Regions:
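Conserved catalytic-core segment of NTP-binding enzymes
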Residues: 118-125, 137-139, 143, 151, ...
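N-terminal beta-loop-helix "entrance" segment that forms/cooperates
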Residues: 44, 49-67, 199-211
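N-terminal Rossmann-like dinucleotide-binding module
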Residues: 3-54
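Short internal beta-strands
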Residues: 42-50, 113-116, 267-270
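N-terminal phosphate/diphosphate-binding loop that engages ATP/GTP or pyrophosphate donors
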Residues: 180-218
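Extreme N-terminal, non-catalytic leader segments
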Residues: 91, 101-160
């Protein structure tokens, strides 16, 4: 089995089926929705019994033509090679109805990629269902050899842009990937550092920040930024996906991202019209003019 934020060889071009149970029309499915928006390699089917047979474009507004099916056996008609868990369930555990299709995928000879906190390769039932030359990639793992941060990114010559958000799930990653595409169109050298499960699944590398022990979190970000910056010229751009939120009371990720990136610029991402933290109406969002000192 594989673990850590480096994708298995060939992953970028492999044929994926996304396990999106109940997550095509909700934030629970944001990992899979992000892959549908931004993955360049093939996605051949989406499993969501709630929307089986419907048009992906009509359900999600995403301009990609992928069949939506009821279960894993139905997805096998489209010859997938890898099953990817496209859900970010609360608490990071594998729900039972998804587990059924994960087992079916492994027994059908597919590889499995998961960004859940639960390490699926260590699950005895799943491990024994896996075929001999297939992998289970648990990407939400602390990288090997993490150390403490030393502000080393401050010595880099290239630009370092860190996305920060007024709330969670406001589009920090999507904004970075849009900038990456824009930079490529202008032949501006740019690299993306994924820091969450979707960013890692899309780019094939990065650091799963919320799997890193807090003392090493800034150091893990620093190491990823230094890797991304290697060989970039002065006008090069390192785009670091933000995590958590500047204003959310549960968010711890902001500080290690600032420390590890030593950013030359911050990209503030906000959901237009939002005035309080999602599901916490008692916490108002500050005026954007107060958040950005002029």
């Amino acid at each position: 089995s594989m673990h850590g934020a480096e994708a298995p060889p060939g992953f970028e071009q492999m044929r994926l089926v996304l396990l999106q149970h109940g997550g095509l029309a909700s934030l629970t499915g944001k990992t899979g929705l992000a892959m549908l928006r931004h993955r360049q390699g093939p996605i051949v089917a989406v499993v969501d019994p709630d929307h089986a047979g419907q048009s992906l474009q009509q359900i999600t507004g995403i301009d990609r033509d992928v069949p939506v099916v009821a279960d894993l056996p139905a997805a096998m008609a489209f010859a997938p090679e890898v099953a990817v868990i496209g859900l970010a369930p609360s608490g990071g555990r594998l729900p039972d109805h998804v587990r059924r299709d994960v087992l079916a995928a492994l027994r059908s000879g597919l590889h499995l990629a998961s960004g859940l906190h639960t390490q699926l390769a260590e699950d005895p039932e799943l491990a024994s269902a896996r075929c001999a030359d297939r992998w289970i990639w648990d990407l939400r793992r602390e990288p090997a050899g993490v150390g403490v941060a030393q502000a080393r990114a401050a010595q880099l010559e290239c630009h370092r842009l860190l996305a920060v958000g007024t709330d969670m799930a406001v589009g920090k990653m999507s904004a970075c990937l849009a900038l990456l595409e824009a930079a490529e169109l202008r032949s501006r050298p740019a690299r993306f550092v994924g820091t969450g499960q979707a960013g890692i699944l899309i780019s094939g590398e990065g650091v799963a920040l919320d799997a890193v022990r807090v003392d090493y979190a800034a150091g893990a970000v620093e190491a990823a930024v230094l890797r991304a910056a290697a060989g970039l010229p002065r006008d090069g751009l390192v785009l670091v996906e933000g995590q958590g939120s500047l204003c959310h009371p549960a968010s711890t990720a902001t500080l290690p991202l600032l420390r590890g990136t030593q950013p030359t610029a911050l990209l503030l991402v906000h959901r237009a019209g939002q005035s309080t933290i999602e599901r916490m109406p008692q916490i108002p969002l500050p005026d954007l003019r107060d958040l950005v000192p002029t």
